From Swiss-Prot:
Chain segments annotated as transmembrane: 20-40, 42-62, 68-88, 89-109, 123-143, 217-237, 244-264, 267-287, 301-321, 322-342
Function (record text): Part of a membrane-bound complex that couples electron transfer with translocation of ions across the membrane. Required to maintain the reduced state of SoxR.
InterPro entries with a match to the protein in the record: NqrB/RnfD (IPR004338), RnfD_bac (IPR011303)
Pfam families membership: NQR2_RnfD_RnfE
Cross-referenced HAMAP family: RsxD_RnfD
Cross-referenced NCBIfam families: PRK00816.1 (NF002011), rnfD (TIGR01946)
Source organism of this protein record: Escherichia fergusonii (strain ATCC 35469 / DSM 13698 / CCUG 18766 / IAM 14443 / JCM 21226 / LMG 7866 / NBRC 102419 / NCTC 12128 / CDC 0568-73)
Top-level EC class as recorded in UniProt: translocase
A GO CC term attached to the entry: plasma membrane
Protein name in UniProt: Ion-translocating oxidoreductase complex subunit D
Main location class: membrane
Length: 352
């Protein structure tokens, strides 16, 4: 008889993991479709590039480690990592950026720690932060939503810009980022951060085309509502628990409301925080990662609330417009401590 010595975790249900990942991917469809509608074909191209890169990088590492490639790839975790990173970056970012970010996420942030179940940080957010710090200009080159865009690129222009940096007619990103008012556009949170630093008040900024007649910015409020719909479905079918998304959103809403009441001229309103940027994507699809989140119910409440406070602090006082990725990683650091102090009491033992 031959005994095989394996490292922890000792129990691993491959089929269950694959099914959960697949359900999360299905829940992402409304968010992906809405981003495609408002920002064009670039979102789909980035997803394809990221998924191919993630699967290739994972297969390469598994081969080097003499692990079963096909069996592990079937858990769909690499596919989900690529997808989450792809929908987080600008649709027309250069092709090599999403490849670099995805490869870094899979190899360094996941496989270097031993693979699925052993990584302390969310791999997709590690990849995103590496790209944001290394290439800040390219990572803020979001297109204006089609409803306020002067030019809406088709598939040919999209591919041309992603792979060459220019449209078929010789234009570049500055042309595509032009709004109907002739002014280069950015995301609502980018616009808010830049304009506040220029001395404008929140009331003045709300008159910009990207905010005009909107709760939280053209396109972005619908994107967030779509991710919310997918997240609610995940809750309904019990793929994720309510503790993290609810505590995160309540914490963010509470901080945003208090800040707005005390400084309405310099701090964004609650609806902007709730329905702009990656709020709903983070709440339901990123923070709820079972590997990098707290494992106790009380711990999940603390973990989500902490992330909500961090998002508000970074958005309001930090150097980056959207703080979801940094908040997730900072909250990941605290998980061992949170789990230690929130672990259930063992019956028959006194509290020590």
């Amino acid at each position: 008889m031959v005994f095989r010595i394996a490292s922890s975790p000792y129990t691993h249900n491959q089929r269950q993991t694959s099914r959960i990942m697949l359900l999360v991917l299905l829940a992402a469809i409304p968010g992906i479709a809405t981003q495609l509608w408002f920002f064009g074909w670039g979102t789909l191209v980035q997803i394809i590039l990221a998924v191919i890169s993630a699967l290739s990088a994972e297969a390469l590492v598994l081969k080097l480690r003499n692990q079963p490639i096909a069996a592990i790839l079937k858990d769909n975790s690499a596919l989900l990592t690529g997808l989450l990173l792809a929908v987080s970056i600008p649709p027309l970012a250069p092709w090599w950026m999403v490849v670099l970010g995805t490869v870094f996420a899979v190899i360094i942030a996941k496989q270097l720690y031993g693979g699925l179940g052993q990584n302390p940080f969310n791999p997709a957010m590690i990849g995103y932060v590496v790209l944001l710090i290394s290439f800040p200009v390219q990572m803020t080159n979001w297109l204006p939503p089609y409803e306020i865009a002067a030019t809406v690129p088709g598939m040919a222009d999209t591919l041309q810009v992603i792979f060459t940096g220019h449209t078929t007619s010789g234009g570049d990103m500055s042309t595509l980022r032009m709004g109907i008012d002739g002014i280069s556009q950015a995301t609502p949170l980018d616009t808010l951060k830049t304009s506040l630093h220029s001395g404008r008040s929140v009331e003045q900024i709300m008159q910009y085309p990207i905010f005009s007649g909107m709760l939280a910015g053209a396109g972005w409020q619908w994107v967030n509502l779509a991710w919310l719909a997918g997240g609610v479905w995940l809750l309904a079918i019990k793929v994720i628990r309510w503790h993290i998304p609810v505590s995160f959103l309540v914490s963010l809403a509470l901080c945003a409301t208090l800040g707005w009441l005390f400084a309405p001229e310099s701090l964004a309103s609650p609806q902007i925080h709730m329905l702009s940027g990656a709020t709903m994507l983070g709440a339901f699809f990123i923070l709820t990662d079972p590997v990098t989140a707290s494992t106790t119910n009380r711990g999940r409440l603390i973990f989500g609330a902490l992330a909500g406070v961090l998002v508000w602090l970074i958005r309001s006082f930090g150097g980056y417009p959207d703080g979801v990725a940094f908040a997730v990683l900072l909250a990941n650091i605290t998980v061992p401590l949170i789990d230690y102090y929130t672990r259930p009491r063992v019956y028959g033992h006194r509290k020590g």
